Amino acid sequence: VADMGLLKMDFLGLRTLTVISKAKANIKKNFGIDIKEEEIPFDDPEIFKLMGSGHTAGVFQVESAGMTATIKNMKPTEYKHVVALIALYRPGPLGAGMVSSYINRMNGKEPAVSYDDRLDDILGETYGTMVYQEQVMLISVEMCGFSKGESDSRIRKPVAKKKIKLLTSTVLHWEDGSDETTYDHWMNGAIKNNYTREVAQKIWDDVLEFASYAFNKSHSAGYAILVMQTAWLKAHYPHEYMAAVLTSYTGKTDKIVHYVSACRHDGIPVLSPDVNESGTEFTATKEGVRFGLAGIRGVGTGVAQAIIAEREAGGP
């Protein structure tokens, strides 16, 4: 698609978007408040308090046991920390020790140093470590003299697609008039810009290793927005939020069992189903989350609606 000059886009259908919408409806019903997710403050300490507590069940992308343990160790205090975590918490970076290195540098346990002081503006936000594809592109421009277009087509794309051999085996024509491999252009450009061969080689070697887990910042930033929004909703409206999470899994008994257990672990009471109190869906009350009739195994939405209709017609 890209070779044809057309824009390629991925549209994700995320359950989380439905959960957020339902949670907002629950909050509106119980408190009369219209929540606008775009106005949720990302500097709210309650977001990071929730993450640090490990009570992240139902929070987008950060509810697995491994991720929960990592967040508790990391102790994020800013949105940018969450963005980096989303990019790093994958098999490649975990195996390479990048996660622990980032956390140690972030918390002052290791020196946060870049390869060269002139690259601090590029690597400063990630404490001297390469985390995003965009950072590799910027280094190729700043240190090696690549044009922005060359940094995308001749560094980012081969790295993202793990076509590492192309970087050292294919001679290309460059905008400065030279004909050489990407590796040679990288090294020659760095030396021309007064970087040492040792620094240029070290970064190149790290870029090749980085290729196994390179992630783009825009993707991480988008996902991190949902992390922040769902964490904020759970922190401030736990009953309404977890009712939305449980409702989203209606018909999936194993998931309901998991999240009921998680609610109780997090101190959120789950009230038993009641023919006189329960709705079709899980509902949020002052006391906790009321089990929805449709969430009972073997009942289903149709039967639940019939029970409620009879209750409304004939009374409790």
Predicted regions and their residues:
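Noncatalytic, beta-rich nucleic-acid-contacting surfaces in large DNA/RNA-processing enzymes
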Residues: 1-316
